[in-house]
Amino acid sequence: MAQKFGAFGKLPALGDFLKMDLPASFVDPWDRWLQEGMLAARSALGDRWQDCYFSAPIWRFNLSPGLAGAAPMTGVMMSSVDRVGRQFPLTLASPQADGSAPVLQ
């Protein structure tokens, strides 16, 4: 059986955030964490921010239960922008209902 996944973030084809099939219990803390991290990175990197943002690798993650919602979450995150160029990562994530944390390859 295929595992359900959802998406949150920016896509060049859209004018605003994409939020698809992810619970607010994940999206709300994940969004806050990303915004705080991006603000800190912009401050620390100054003029180098944009180059660093767009050359960042795709990140794979496993989140323990309670970090961003009750369920453990597995996913990937990459740099992206919306239609007018506003920067914000795109995240694809899936809750692990059985409590497992699969190895990402």
Task: Spell out what each predicted region is.
Residues 36-86:
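An N-terminal, globular interaction/scaffold subdomain
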Residues 2-17, 21-22, 66-105:
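Long protein-protein interaction modules used by eukaryotic assembly/scaffold proteins
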Residues 2-58:
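N-terminal ordered "arm"
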